[in-house]
């Protein structure tokens, strides 16, 4: 038998999601807020972790509260599912950014100027030992200085920072969600025990 669910996200969550999309696409890309405000990308990825966890949490909570299914997840499991859902969304988004950079020749994985690099490819002995170049103040490509004041890291630091702040946003919401569901779960158990006691 097929079971259908009427999915209703809280109005406040829907508004926040729309504001997030506007902030990322209209302000971030078109109005170039990513360039004007260096923290813009970090704030949005943190918020993304929070929102994706909220959506994952809402979906699991929908199943928990539905009368059509025998489905009751513990508060801890609900929080874990919300966290994993958020991290999966974050990783898939980074795949999307990488794909757009490779296929469409964009620059969604923003570059970072750094002053130290370490690589085993630079080891003169050809061994698996990281060789460091420190205090980099300029880099030349094909004999032409880039004038950036350091070495240009193409996307790695941006990707890792995005995933880390996504992790933080997801973790914060999952912890808050855990305590919210736990309190509601305990209230439901109390009401059920009270009903059983009154029955007998």
Model-inferred region functions:
Residues 8-19, 42-45:
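Cytoplasmic-side transmembrane-helix entry/capping segments in multi-pass membrane proteins
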Residues 2-12, 68-73:
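Membrane-interface helix-boundary motifs at transmembrane edges
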Residues 187-200:
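Short, highly charged, low-complexity non-transmembrane loops/tails of multi-pass membrane proteins
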Residues 60-74, 114-120, 182-186:
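Alpha-helical transmembrane bundle and helix-membrane interface signal
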Residues 30-41, 87-173:
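Interfacial helix-loop-helix junctions of multi-pass membrane proteins
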Residues 47-64, 102-108, 168-182:
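Membrane-interfacial alpha-helical segments at the cytosolic side of multi-pass membrane proteins
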Residues 19-24, 48-56, 78-93:
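Alpha-helical transmembrane segments of multi-pass integral membrane proteins
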Residues 2-7, 26-35, 62-63:
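Transmembrane alpha-helix boundary signature
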């Amino acid at each position: 038998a097929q079971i259908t669910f009427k999915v209703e996200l809280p109005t406040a969550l829907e508004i926040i999601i729309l504001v997030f999309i506007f902030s990322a696409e209209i302000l971030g890309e078109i109005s170039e807020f990513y360039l004007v405000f260096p923290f813009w990308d970090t704030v949005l990825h943190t918020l993304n972790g929070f929102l994706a966890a909220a959506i994952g949490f809402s979906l699991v909570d929908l199943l928990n509260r539905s009368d059509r299914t025998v489905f009751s997840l513990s508060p801890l499991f609900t929080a874990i599912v919300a966290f994993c859902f958020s991290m999966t969304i974050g990783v898939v988004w980074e795949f999307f950014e990488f794909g757009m950079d490779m296929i469409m020749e964009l620059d969604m994985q923003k570059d970072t100027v750094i002053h130290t690099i370490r690589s085993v490819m630079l080891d003169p002995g050809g061994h698996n030992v990281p060789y460091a170049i420190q205090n980099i103040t300029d880099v030349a490509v094909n004999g032409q200085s880039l004038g950036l004041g350091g070495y240009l890291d193409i996307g790695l630091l941006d990707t890792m920072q995005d995933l880390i702040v996504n992790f933080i946003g997801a973790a914060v919401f999952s912890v808050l969600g855990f305590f919210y569901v736990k309190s509601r779960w305990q209230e439901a158990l109390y009401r059920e025990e009270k009903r059983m006691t009154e029955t007998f």
